[in-house]
Amino acid sequence: MAYPTVDSPYGLKPVNLIGGQVFAGSTRMYNIDYAYATDIFYGDFVALVRGNLERISVTSGTAGTLVGIFLGCSYTNPTTKQKQFSQYWPASTAAGDCVAYVCDDPDTVFQAAICSSGTTIASGARAMIGQNLACLNNTGNSNTGNSKNALAAPTDTPATTSSLPIRVMGLVPETAVSLGTATYTSISTATVTCSALPFALPVGTDVGSLAANGQYIPSGSFVDTAASAGATSFILNQAPVTAFGASATLVFTQYPELLVKLNFGQHEYYAGTATA
């Protein structure tokens, strides 16, 4: 079993930079306006509006308005009058000295969970690497202060659409879940018939097969529609690159997390038009 188990999304977490550079934890400080009326959670997308930081809902794209990812803040607590360091900005806090910490490097690589809808964990796949994804905008957790934003699992071929906010850089093998195997029977277009699945397949599940010599053969495809345990068929997003062999052993792997970066043109530092 994979460890740790990923049971809910947590926004975007910086891990390194493209080109193998190390993320040193460096952030840029921006102000949040007095009594700004929206919660901002750790891992949320943020933008600048008239010099102040605001949370921004990101689903299909932002066209050069993002300034980065929110990583906490500090402000004078209006009740205790003491400096408070917080994982998130509570909406409508009557503080005018808030400093937010933002991961603003456009080349940052982030780790994020992928969901089919809301906060339902799905799967990434090898076939998604190099492609673009949309995001799911969810309300964060005020108990932990963490974001609940997620990557949106595609139900078809991952998009090449330039307006989508996220580029997939890689899988996170440390949290991969080996779902098991089934015996291949036949395929019609992208619908695969097999022995009864002893497990459910979430959207995005990576599918491969075993060659006669025991080597793993990636299909270049993933599960398009969630399949229930006991099902004798499932649907791929497209036909496999290499046809499954007769009675081949099909191998199913769930990757609940992906490595991603902001797609080109999403970050305001790489946009010619300044924010209003």
What is each PLM-predicted segment?
Residues M1-S178, G208-S219, T249-A276:
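Surface-exposed, low-hydrophobicity beta-strand/loop segments enriched in small/polar/acidic residues
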Residues A35-A37, M128, L133-A134, I187-G245:
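Extended, beta-strand-rich, solvent-exposed assembly scaffolds of outer structural proteins
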Residues V177-T189:
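Disulfide-bonded cysteine-rich modules in secreted/extracellular proteins
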